[in-house]
Amino acid sequence: MKPTNYHLFDFMDFDVDLSKNESLWKAYKPTSVCEKGGDVHVVVPFQKQVLANDMAADVATPKEEYTLILRQYSNNIIRLFCGFGEYEMTDNSEMLQFSERIQQLPLHVKAEDGGWTILSADGVRRAYINVKAPVLDHWSDLLPEPQETLDVVLYPDGKKEVRLAAYDHFSPPRYDALPLAYCVKDGNKERATLSFECKADECFAGTGERFTKMDLSGHTFFLKNQDGQGVNNRRTYKNIPFYLSSRMYGTFYHTCAHSKLSLADVSTRSVEFLSDQAMIDAFVIAGDSMEEILRGYRDLTGYPSMPPLWSFGIWMSRMTYFSADEVQEICDRMRAEHYPCDVIHLDTGWFRTDWLCEWKFNDERFPDPEGFIHGLKDKGYRVSLWQLPYVAEEAEQIDEARANDYIAPLTKQQDSEGSNFSALDYAGTIDFTYPKATEWYKGLLKQLLDMGVVCIKTDFGENIHMDAKYKGMKPELLNNLYALLYQKAAYEVTKDVTGDGIVWARAAWAGCQRYPLHWGGDSCSSWDGLAGSLKGGLHFGLSGFAFWSHDVPGFHTLPNFMNSVVDDKVYMRWTQFGVFSSHMRYHGTNKREPWHYPAIASMIKKWWKLRYYLLPYLVEQSQKATQSGYAVLRALIFAHPADKVCWHIDDEYYFGDDFLVAPVMNSDDCRDIYLPEGNWVNFFTGEHFKGGQWLYGVKVPLEEMPVYVREGACIPVYPEDVDCTDEMDLSKVTHLCIDDSFKGVWK
């Protein structure tokens, strides 16, 4: 359908010809406000609309009343809930995991002339509900009077004002946003919308792994997980129904329904949310820092757990290793040539047939998998395995899975997409809404973990079979939530068997941050693939996630997806980015081992050793991230939300508290660098710089990277070369002091 540039069609999803049996119901001003169980209940009438290109009240149809509930948590979070029909407010949700900091604060109502003020017990104003008539200087009857509206101002922390978009219209019939409304189709309530005012200069970030510029204003996002098929488009593996505002608040929409989020786009003066569920459940979180807001989000949805030490070492993989002998040869060479490495990952080739996931080793190419795994462990390597949450028609488990409904029964045959990269090419999706199916899946993984495998790559999970009957919910609601249920199952059984909670996951939704870690999907081995990956990682860190990785040096090649050669400079610059990432894994469609790039192999080894040198710092910063709102990779706005320049920088980042990293993402070995406030020291040259300035046209030799460390920082480091983390004795950790005596890390 071609865009119309009208809210009713482009955002609210009504057909242009209005041929369907659909109606829109708009919120009017409240009729009563009262206290109930510590909450405030606001009775709101909704008026059906006569729809054309415009909207007008259908006065022949009686209004319907619904209750808008306001609930205050702690000192900076206010919750708005309005269920249309059968929906009720609940904390019983896979997405929610309240911390002990989430305490409900009773709210009180103070009636005033023209409205109600909502106060917490300490007398702090938390909301104001306005029903005063607008001030008019009446001189014309040319246009109809505007309809009533819902005018509510929220003060989540008692200071910051977040207002519903009560008056976002042109003439009275021409609306660009609605404060609160719902839709009815064929007699069923189907969609709901909530809108907040935004300011002309307001900026936004977050919403998941978003492969676009830092400031998201002027964009509308469809929050539906799907295979991103790269990192340079609007698709994404990881949608998170949460955004951050430069006005120092964030909003978490508690839903797993397919949704739209317009950030000053459909209307440039509103943030608009549309859910395919006839319910609004929004948590508005205010704070004095980005970290405080994100900590509030984690207080609601859960904190990341701490990955094991070995996971911070280097992972080596490709798509794919096909035999134990091949893996042994590669691992032995890395040890002989002292390329430090901790994890060897087996992708799609360890099964009976490539890509045919049966959760069993090929008994010809891996004749003794347990001995193979333990032999690698003796050399300091852990083994990670690829798999996916679908069962193929040819898999040996298919009859058992069908007979017991471990895969959701299809309601109709779906067309294959003719690719290994699609859920539709499998016979069914494992039904994680069904406890017996979850336990069956855990049993498949347990057999592998009992052999000594330490990590399961929980690939895919963005797409499910939509024409299927799942035990616990409709596929339209399960689609986004599926990643959480899938990763939770793999994480739990891994932790139960090995003691270490970890997965290697691609998809995500709200709550998935509890089950680290996630990587950025199938990027192209190119400069734009590198740039898109970093953008996605920065927004992901602004969406509640602490840990994130990416395929070094990109996953696929161009023009030939599997067989084009990766450029040496791309390999080198992406390696540098990987060293300064929370986790570092080499992976892709062709060879990734450094000796296949002989011109730069010695430089690569030097950078790998730098990674292990910095592991104590990385572990320190990771522990901090699991107890706060911080990510390991942080966009500059994390620390400088008031610096308008930082809202437009998506190619630099903080690595923990003390490192400022500016990857080179071109073949010219040159870039501009913004130094935010503070005093900075070049990590490789020892040169000192004052912050708050641009460095233009900085030339960067291939063996170096623009990395700056805070003046006065004291960085914990490991002083000895090691081949893996098993060789580390953490009592030997020393500190690198960034003072006048520091002349560069390699000097």
Model-derived features: where do they sit?
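Active-site-proximal structural scaffolding
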Residues: 63, 235-236, 244, 273-275, ...
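A conserved hydrophobic secondary-structure block that centers on an alpha-helix together
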Residues: 228, 232-233, 317-366
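Catalytic core of carbohydrate-active enzymes
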Residues: 491-496, 500-501, 508-519, 532, ...
